[in-house]
C-alpha cells in the first residue's frame, strides 16, 4: 500500500464564511473567504482551510494562528477568548461562537459535503476490546467481495488502498469527514470505523450516520473518564440511536451486550457464542491451531455460514462473526459473503497488525505481540494461547500511563494466574512515573501464590529475557504495545516497534522470525 501524510479529498467543493456562519450560529467578522477544508492543528493545515482555534490543556489554539496562516489557512473559527486576542483592526476572516468544538461535525460536514445522498455504507464498531480487529475483518470481507474499501482504526487509516497514519482511536470530526469525502470521490463502497466512547462524548461522530453499528463487549476500562461501568455503557450506547445509525448488531457474550440490546429503539441483531445466551445468531469454533480458526454461524431460520480466518481465540472469532453479521444486516446476502470467502474454505483474507500477531516462524517457540491492555483482554489472549501451547506460556506486559490505574492490579493478577511466567515492563508511560505503573501490575501479579514474576523496566531487555526462557513447544506473548510505532515518554513520541524488538530477540536467540 502507498502511504500519505494528510488525508483530504482532492476534488473538494468550497463553502463561503457567509454560508457557514448561520449554520454554526457564529458571528462573522472581516472579509469573506471560500473554505475548502477544516484543520484543528497547524501540522494538518492545507491551503484553503479554516483553522479552528480551540482552548487546549496548556494553551489556546489562537496562539498558533500565525503558523496556520503561513501554512495556507484562509480563516479562523474560535471562541470569544480566542477572538479577544486579535486586534480590532485585524483583516483575518473570522467566525466566533461559544463552543467551536461542539460544532466541528457541523462545520466539516458542510465543507466536505458528506451529508449528500449516495455515499458509501458506513460500519461503526464500538466496545472495550475487539474494535480494531472487527474493523480489519470488516474491511477484509468487503474487499473479498470486490468492494473498494476504507477503514479507520487505532492502528491506521486507509482509503482505497492508500494508508494514512493514525494517532487517535477515532479521529476528530474534521478528519472523519475528510476521510468520508475522499472515500466518496474514490468510489468506495464500504467504510469501517473504530469508535471509542471518548469520541462519542467529544462529538467526533457528529453528522456521521452509520448504516450498521456493531458492539463487541464491555469490561473494566477507562474509569478515569467514566467512573463506573454504567456510565461507560451509557457513553457507548450513544452510537445506537436513531440519529446515529440505521440498525445494530450486538454481541451478547457479556451481560452489558444483553443490556444494550434490550434498550434498542432501532432494529437489532444479536449474537452469542454460547447456546445458553439468548441470541438470534450463535457461533461455534470447529477447528483452531496456531495459524487460524474455523467456525460456524447459525441464524434464527437455520441459516448456516461457515468461515475461516488467520485469527486465534474465541474472542477473535466473536469479532469476525460480528463483522459478518454487520455486512448481512446491511443487505449483503449470505451466499454472496460465503462465495467471496471461497465457500468458507479459503477464509477471510485479513491481516490484523499487533493483535495476537505472530512474529515467529519455524519449529521454535511461538512468539506473539498483542495490544491487550485490560484484564478481560489479557484473559482472552492467555486462555487462547494456553489451549494451543503444549509447554509454558511466558507473558511480557506493561500498560499505559495517565489512564485508569484501578485496573492495573486486576490485570497483574490475571496475568500471573494464567501465565507460567510474567515479566512486567514499561509500555507507554506518557507523563506518569513508569515505576508507579509497573507497581500497579506487580501488586496484582505478586498476590498470586507461587507466581513467577519479574520486573524489567526496559521493554527490549524484557522481551529478550522472555525469549531466553523458552524452548520449542513454549509460547511468549507481549501484551500492550501491539502495532504501535512509538512510545509516549513525557509527551515525546519516541520511535519504537515491539514487533521489531521481538523479531530481533528471536533471531539473536537463534530462532526464526517472520
PLM regions and their residue ranges:
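ATP-dependent carboxylate-amine ligase
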Residues: 1-29, 45-50, 60-63, 143, ...
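N-terminal leader/targeting and accessory segments in enzymes
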Residues: 1-106, 255, 282-284, 304, ...
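Residue-level signal for inorganic ion chemistry
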Residues: 20, 49, 68, 107, ...
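Short, hydrophobic beta-strand segments that form beta-sheet elements in well-ordered domains
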Residues: 37-38, 72-79, 193, 248-251, ...
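Short, conserved loop/helix-junction motifs that constitute active-site signature segments
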Residues: 69-71, 87-89, 206-209, 239-244, ...
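Short internal beta-strands
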Residues: 70, 74-80, 249-252, 394-397, ...
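Acidic, Mg2+-coordinating active-site environments of NTP-dependent enzymes
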Residues: 82-88, 201, 210-366, 443-446, ...
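Phosphate-binding loop of NTP-binding sites
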Residues: 103-252, 256-267, 513
Amino acid at each position: 500500500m502507498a502511504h500519505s501524510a494528510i488525508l483530504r479529498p482532492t476534488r473538494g467543493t468550497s463553502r463561503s464564511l457567509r454560508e457557514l456562519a448561520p449554520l454554526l450560529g457564529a458571528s462573522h467578522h472581516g472579509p469573506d473567504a471560500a473554505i475548502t477544508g477544516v484543520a484543528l492543528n497547524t501540522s494538518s493545515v492545507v491551503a484553503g482551510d479554516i483553522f479552528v482555534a480551540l482552548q487546549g490543556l496548556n494553551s489556546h489554539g489562537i496562539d498558533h494562528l500565525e503558523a496556520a496562516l503561513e501554512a495556507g489557512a484562509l480563516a479562523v473559527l474560535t471562541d470569544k477568548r480566542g477572538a479577544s486576542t486579535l486586534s480590532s483592526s485585524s483583516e483575518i476572516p473570522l467566525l466566533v461562537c461559544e463552543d467551536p468544538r461542539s460544532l466541528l461535525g457541523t462545520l466539516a460536514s458542510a465543507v466536505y459535503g458528506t451529508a449528500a445522498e449516495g455515499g458509501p455504507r458506513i460500519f461503526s464498531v464500538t466496545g472495550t476490546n475487539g474494535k480494531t480487529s472487527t474493523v480489519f475483518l470488516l474491511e477484509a470481507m468487503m474487499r473479498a467481495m470486490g468492494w473498494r474499501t476504507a477503514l479507520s482504526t487505532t492502528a491506521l487509516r486507509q482509503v482505497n488502498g492508500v494508508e494514512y497514519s493514525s494517532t487517535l482511536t477515532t479521529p476528530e470530526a474534521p478528519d472523519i469527514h475528510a476521510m468520508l469525502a475522499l472515500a466518496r470521490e474514490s468510489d468506495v463502497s464500504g467504510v469501517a470505523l473504530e469508535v471509542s466512547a471518548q469520541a462519542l462524548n467529544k462529538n467526533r461522530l457528529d453528522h456521521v450516520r452509520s448504516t450498521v453499528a456493531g458492539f463487541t463487549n464491555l469490561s473494566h476500562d477507562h474509569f478515569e473518564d467514566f467512573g463506573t461501568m454504567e456510565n461507560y455503557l451509557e457513553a457507548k450506547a450513544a452510537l445506537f440511536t436513531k440519529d446515529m445509525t440505521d440498525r445494530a448488531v450486538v454481541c451478547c457474550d457479556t451481560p452489558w451486550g444483553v443490556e444494550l440490546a434490550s434498550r434498542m429503539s432501532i432494529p437489532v441483531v444479536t449474537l452469542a457464542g454460547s447456546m445458553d445466551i439468548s441470541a438470534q445468531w450463535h457461533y461455534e469454533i470447529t477447528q483452531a491451531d496456531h495459524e487460524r480458526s474455523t467456525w460456524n454461524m447459525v441464524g434464527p431460520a437455520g441459516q448456516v455460514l461457515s468461515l475461516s480466518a488467520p485469527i486465534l481465540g474465541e474472542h477473535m472469532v466473536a469479532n469476525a462473526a460480528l463483522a459478518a453479521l454487520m455486512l448481512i444486516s446491511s443487505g449483503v446476502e449470505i451466499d454472496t459473503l460465503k462465495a467471496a470467502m471461497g465457500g468458507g474454505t479459503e477464509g477471510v483474507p485479513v491481516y490484523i497488525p499487533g493483535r495476537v500477531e505472530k512474529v515467529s516462524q519455524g519449529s521454535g517457540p511461538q512468539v506473539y505481540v498483542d495490544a491487550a491492555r485490560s484484564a478481560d483482554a489479557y484473559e482472552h489472549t492467555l486462555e487462547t494461547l494456553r489451549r494451543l501451547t503444549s509447554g509454558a506460556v511466558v507473558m511480557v506486559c506493561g500498560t499505559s500511563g495517565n489512564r485508569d490505574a484501578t485496573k492495573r492490579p486486576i490485570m497483574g493478577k490475571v496475568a500471573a494466574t494464567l501465565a507460567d511466567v510474567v515479566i512486567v515492563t514499561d509500555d507507554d508511560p506518557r507523563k506518569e512515573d513508569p515505576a508507579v505503573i509497573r507497581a500497579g501490575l506487580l501488586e496484582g501479579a505478586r498476590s498470586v501464590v507461587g507466581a513467577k514474576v519479574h520486573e524489567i523496566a526496559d521493554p527490549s531487555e524484557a522481551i529478550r529475557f522472555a525469549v531466553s526462557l523458552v524452548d520449542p513447544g513454549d509460547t511468549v506473548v507481549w501484551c500492550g504495545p501491539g502495532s504501535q510505532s512509538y512510545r509516549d515518554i513525557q509527551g515525546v513520541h519516541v520511535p519504537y516497534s515491539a514487533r521489531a524488538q521481538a523479531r530481533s530477540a528471536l533471531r539473536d536467540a537463534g530462532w526464526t522470525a517472520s
